[in-house]
Amino acid sequence: MKKYDVVVIGGGHSGCEAAAAAARIGAKTLLITHSISTIGEMSCNPAIGGIAKGIVVREVDALDGLMGKVIDNASINSTILNRSKGPAVWGPRAQADRDLYRHAMQNSILNYPNLTVLEASVENFTTTDNQELPTINSVITADQEVIYTKKLILTTGTFLQGTIHIGSYNTPAGRFNEQSSVGLAKTLASYNFKLGRLRTGTPPRLDRNSINFSGLQEQKGDTPPSPFSYMSESINLPQISCYLTATNTKTHEVIKNNLHKAAASNLLKEIKAPRYCPSIEEKVRRFSERNSHQVFLEPEGLNSEIIYPNGITTSSPLDVQQTMLKTILGLENVKIVRSGYSVEYNFIDPRELYHTLETKKIRGLYCAGQINGTTGYEEAAGQGIIAGINAALSLNSNYEPFILKRNDAYIGVMIDDLVTLGTSEPYRLFTSRAEYRLRLRSDNADLRLTELGYKISAVSYQRYLTLNRKKEEVTKLTNILKETVILPSQLSQHGVCISQDGRKRSAFDLLSNPNINMNILSKICNQIKNYHANTIQQVEIEAKYAPYFIKQELDIQSFIAEENTHIPHDIEFSQIHGLSTEIQEKLQYMKPPSIGSARRIPGVTPAAITNILFYLRYHKNKKIL
């Protein structure tokens, strides 16, 4: 008889983080996957990070997750998006060698302490009914093997009753040539989970040798490339270029003439696709006034002959794809290695989940990744690590849930959006979703999260020591700058003019001036040069934003006060005077854990919040009396 503390189904980006997190905390963990060889597979684009997404990768890394370290072993073109804007919206991104990424993730997972990997297909799970809610008991594989578990995490990606479409052709699959999961979908439906249908897509893969790069715009990465992980010193792989081309009026004519053949325009038109990553057919239809759309030609590896054309996701028939591609500059003689396609799949309404990502209907069942209605490797990884941590912590009956709030992390923003608002289309993170993005930056994820993770045993002692060393260096340099007084006359010697009022200003305060940076100050304060470049950058960013932090702190304190005003899980909203039936039903279904969470539910009015607060205070005082 096989028994585990935590079982994770799915070996994608979410499943790997969930399994590793649970094992790291000490849970006896089993990861079940259709194929060990596809653990860590990059199903779509060969890249990690981006705007907001790159910050999530840093947050996962700050909690000792895998993604940051793995991409640092596979990065072949690294850049910081939005570098011309403020640090709050910088987006670290790395092009990956697809094979190196997969191998590095597999090496991590297959050698992880407390973690076992099983190659099997799970068709069902069972529960016990000896408590107020059904409780996870076991999983059953396709060959009828029963594996007992206390906690189960579903990270099924696009495999939950997945179907692939290429033109009028369709076949059950969660990924090209990989079977979908049908049994689990039926099991979830039997427990009355609210299931929906979403779709996503991928472009055709191209033969590098059939592309003429000579007339295309070369896109080199940063020099030197920046690592994702706070534990990585540098990127050691050779860096190669991507190339930029674009569609044109001829391309669009081919697409328009064949729109009726594309699955996304025909069979799947009622199923929502990612709004911010539309297919080329949808781009042409929605933006008919545009004569071109960018296409980024991204290499899939250092030794790969395959090019990923980012920007032309399609579900058209193969012959239409070929005709369309040959109208694009550089692709006149292109050969398709693998067809683009669209995939539709089941997802759970994320409002069926708590902030821990445990389901409300089955105790001990957690969901993470695309099954919750999100899109993207990074969003999946962020959910996976939270589900894994909470599943492991909940093995102790007296555990405190690990919940990241909206002012803690982008992961907290994402999960709160999902479980509070739900989603009707694939959810993607943006910096605009975060109210406190001045604090939620890519440079300080470790300062925000690593100590929190260490307190619950999710972070290693080595990483904790690394954090403390960084904090010491940042504090030392900050103090030096605050104690160093600089006159306007000293700055004028270096070509910087500020008010000649003779007033003494600290070097730290001067950094809030957009015309002053660490490079200038280092010519006056020689001690700056004694510190690592990362420390210098960290202190400079903190100083630049310092005046804004003071203003934002009041908002954060108000937010925290509402988040700390807890609503009992067993509260009967029907007993609260003044709530409409509609609001009562919404609150009873959602079961918000706090006043802040209740306030963010659409349709819950300020008056309703006042009534809830009055009810909570009355009953609190009644208990005291």
Swiss-Prot record:
SUPFAM superfamilies listed in its UniProt record: FAD/NAD(P)-binding domain (SSF51905)
Region of interest: Disordered: 204-226
Primary location recorded for the protein, binned into one broad class: cytoplasm
Any GO CC annotation of this UniProt entry: cytoplasm
Native source species: Ehrlichia ruminantium (strain Gardel)
Function: NAD-binding protein involved in the addition of a carboxymethylaminomethyl (cmnm) group at the wobble position (U34) of certain tRNAs, forming tRNA-cmnm(5)s(2)U34.
Residues the entry annotates as binding NAD(+): 273-287
Name of encoding gene: mnmG
Family of the protein in this entry: Belongs to the MnmG family.
Descriptive protein name: tRNA uridine 5-carboxymethylaminomethyl modification enzyme MnmG
